[in-house]
Amino acid sequence: MLAQFLRSLFRFRKTTVSVLLVATYVVVFLLNVWDRIRYQYSLPEDNKHHKQLLDASWIDLQSITRKPHPYTSRENDAVHDFLLHRVTELVEGAPHAEVSDDYKEGNHLVFKQPDVFNSSSTESRIVSFESSNIVVKITGSQPELPGLLISAHFDSVPTALGATDDGVGIVTLLALITRYAKKQPRRTLVFNLNNNEEFGLLGASAFLNHRWRPLVDYVLNLEGTGAGGKAVLFRTSDTNTASIYKNAVKTQPFGNSIYQQAFYDRYISSETDYKVYEQAGLRGWDIAFYKPRALYHTIKDSTQFTSQASLWNMMHASLQLADFIAFESFEDEPKDRSPAVYFDIIGTFFVTASTKDLFTLNCVVLSVIPVIILVLEFVIQRRKTRERNPLLVWLRLPFSMFISYLVTATFRSSLFRVNPLIFSRDYVSPTIGFSFTFLILNYLVLSLLEYLAPSRDLKTVSFVELFFGMWIALLWATIRLCTSKYTATGVYPITVLYLLMSFGAIVGLVCSAFKRKHSVVKAKDSEETAAPNTYSSIEESPQQATNTEAPNENSPEEHDERAPLLRASNSSQVSSVTNVSEAPSSALKAFVVSALNYDWSVQFLAVVPLASFFVIMCLSLILDGIYQTCQEGFQATWNVSKISMLGGMLLAIPVLPFCYKLNYFVSMVLLFAAASAGIFSFERAPFTESSPLKLRFSQELNLHDELGFSTVNVFGRQGAGIEQILRNIPSTQNAHSNVECTSNGQGSETCRYAGPRPHLVSSSSIPELSDILSIKVLSNNRKSSGRSSYEPINAELVINVKENRLCTIGFNSSQFAEHDYGQSPVKQVTIFGNAHHDNRTRSQLSTLDGLSRDDEENRIFKWNRGINSLQLHKLDFERNYYHVGIQWMPTILSQDADEESSDALGLKIRCFWGEYDSVSIINGEVKRKVPALDELLAYSPKEVSFSNREAGLVIVNDYIEL
């Protein structure tokens, strides 16, 4: 009985392969689901201290997310004051703690801000910024040790409440301050609760100007680029910092260096404060929420759509990491500062390695394993254990994969034409459709070829072919590692898959090389037809596949996978094999010969589960992060669909050597799953309330527009029905306003209509636009007879603007356009501390690039390579002006000057307002500040969400010429 059971269990037959495949997919699926939801069941119920921290943090989160609070709003000041009160309260009585408030201390900086999204950009943007960061210092008992900066930002965008971005990070900082105010750490910790991250990462830049900046060498940045879920280790500086995270975060570590490479390669277009700190020389960790993108920066970024489980997930990881750095000793060798490869395994294990070590490993396995394969092939050829005329067998898998790829690619192209935005709602269905379509087509082609010409070599030949395919992929990945200076931290899955395919190929070749030569088995049982004995595992012909009964006890027992692993003691069977050498006489040799026939089970169990798990783990992480970027344009949609298709095919590839052994039932299940996934992908609506269409709003007014139109701009994905949405709101229906949509040529469009005017400021009467914004030129010596034609031109102006915190000035001339061509003639800007013209400043101009101050503490910034734009921020709503000076060079000094060139300088002035969830009092009546946005939120379908397009919701424009 045992012999018959083992014979049936380990036989290379359709039922066994099918059961193992189904079991593999079920286990991998359950592990993936558990990894996704596990954090929801990990609240600190048994730890009183942690529970108190969590409860207090949740109350704090609710307090700071009552309203949107961008830097440009008064609510931003309310959040600042609340946080200042909280940290002062938390550190009270702690002699090793100190609080600094940039608002009171007047941290005003003027600096040239590099383009954090494009390191090769030559654009020169000068920023004048008044900071209101709250900085807390916890002095360590060993302050000589390198300190740790922990940072998060408390501003939100104008359209969001800022719960995940970045309220959770802020209240996590409050929890950490609570802990270390009571328990002094060894290292000094500095907490930067910074303001105005959303529009320029300016709060982080302001910290670099703070007196406590020299105390820290490490940084932990907490961010939210999604809305809830789990917080991931986006990136870390190097192998040392990755190892610190590994040693610190023992409970539910979560991170993957695939995301890190996406930042390196600029596939992720947004940035976090971590970039500023990294450029300043700090090393550390960037931990952030990363999905779903469609709720990010919308009104649904609120406590209603996140949870205490998400809060605890970020808080617990931060506590573990901060505790380790604060209290433990660790090595930080300079030699281990190459970029790191890292990933977690279902939140239980964390693996990290140097990319240089990965490069070395790749070089070794690229060289050694092919030699092993070739040696085994040579042995097989010498021993003649391979069947004759193998060329057609070697062509089967490439032919099958080619046909399957063509059909799968056609499926993807059709989906891209019919329902391209389905990925924004659900990437799982298309990916399953791609994967199972590819698998079932390979099954059909390979099964047909096997039926027409049975082969005993197909499985191992397939592994060898897949090995060489992965060899090419690994060669590319290794070259990529080298050429990227080891920043390609996301290529490690190729190494893993290469090693797995290599193992499968080597096992098959070893078993083939040391088996007996080709022979024919003669079975007395009429139910067993003659079959070759054995190269690799004996593979049934289609006629044999239907016969699953065990052979008669009196029939000969073959030395193949149908034999039991251990012989029965009373066995009296004899071999009836022809054309073979004498059977092994010893029981050990007989066992080895018999065991060699079970190579298929070793191959399957080692390759398919591990490869499937690894592919699903990496693919789900990638698609989780990018699937809703398909709303950003044609190219983004194409990229998401391509990754989904290639990932689905990669999931099927480890099964290909075995797929022709799937039975009818499983093949029909796969076919049904592929068809169902395809139908869902084609027919379902791409947007739902939980996965909405994300549109971006702005409203613009031009100061000298005689008609006084207030233009509402709605930006979004072309083909998503934006025009129809806008035609169904009261403003366009009642006033018969025309909706005009223009494409940007890349899959996005901007639709415009005349909307209700905003009410930006309170007034006793209906204010004119010129009452809100006006430009006054105080001086301009361009046409002065006292100025030499070779002398720089100087001008001063005041921008009078009410209840405002942000204006920008873009420069252009006859030879220069702000973002298009030429070098700006503007070489110097001055930020005056008052609104009054003062000629004394002109004689004190700096001759060096950079920032200087005059006797009146006016800030002067000089940049001889040209200044493209000036960004002006201020904190005081009651100071209704910006006073600036501008110096530019006459065209006569330009090599590109011509007769039509003019010395005139054009100024495009834009001022931004970011409040909408508040009111103004106009002529005694209560008016909502931005009724156009209120209208869109009220009357748009529930499947639509809105975010801001610009730094403010309302922009007032003016243009003057100096």
From Swiss-Prot:
The chain crosses the membrane at residues 15-35, 360-380, 391-411, 432-452, 461-481, 490-510, 602-622, 640-660, 662-682. It is found in: Vacuole membrane. The active site is at residue 197. Keywords: Glycoprotein, Hydrolase, Membrane, Metal-binding, Metalloprotease, Protease, Transmembrane, Transmembrane helix, Vacuole, Zinc. Its main location: membrane. Residues 36-359, 412-431, 482-489, 623-639, 683-962 are vacuolar. Residues 531-563 are annotated as: Disordered. It comes from the Eukaryota. It is an enzyme of class 3 (hydrolase). Glycans are attached at residues 118, 639, 812, 839. This is Vacuolar membrane protease. It comes from Lachancea thermotolerans (strain ATCC 56472 / CBS 6340 / NRRL Y-8284) (Yeast).
